[in-house]
Amino acid sequence: MPTSTSPPVDSSLVHGEVVFDETGRSFSGATVYVRLEDVSRADAPARIVAEQILQDIAHTAGTATQLQFALEGAVPDERARYAVRVHVDVDGDGQVSRGDFLSMESYPVLTYGNPNNVTVRVQELR
């Protein structure tokens, strides 16, 4: 029986951009956490493989704000599933809370034919 895996991947380099929802409110001084996560285990928390932290980020409501990112971790397991997740910590408390911006969709990368370049849209948590 054939297995459902992708060809081997040489590196877990993932790059792309974070795009803010234009309807979200203005802010400044935020910290953005961009994480590459192993999301293979259905009933367990995702494991962080790589993280980039962007500090002192600002966004003006009604404008298109884009941030570039690059994440690199160990060579990925071709049988695992990976995704990029973004949390924009507006209030600086280190927790996901109302007023922060989050990626609300899954952004799979690296294995199973998924890309290594993604555009991650974030929306304000209301």
Where are these regions (language model features)?
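A short, amphipathic beta-strand motif
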Residues: S12-D21
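A beta-strand/beta-hairpin structural motif
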Residues: A50-A74
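Short beta-strand and strand-turn-strand segments in soluble, beta-rich domains
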Residues: D43-Q52, R98-M104
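Extracellular beta-sheet/turn segments enriched in Thr/Pro/Gly and aliphatic residues
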Residues: P2-P7, Y107-R126
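Short acidic/polar inter-strand loop motif in beta-rich domains
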Residues: P76, H87-L102
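A short beta-turn/strand-edge loop motif at beta-sheet boundaries
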Residues: T23-G29, D43, P76-E78
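Short solvent-exposed capping/turn motifs at the termini of beta-strands
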Residues: F20-E22, D38, V90
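Beta-strand signatures of extracellular beta-sandwich domains
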Residues: T31-E37, A83-H87
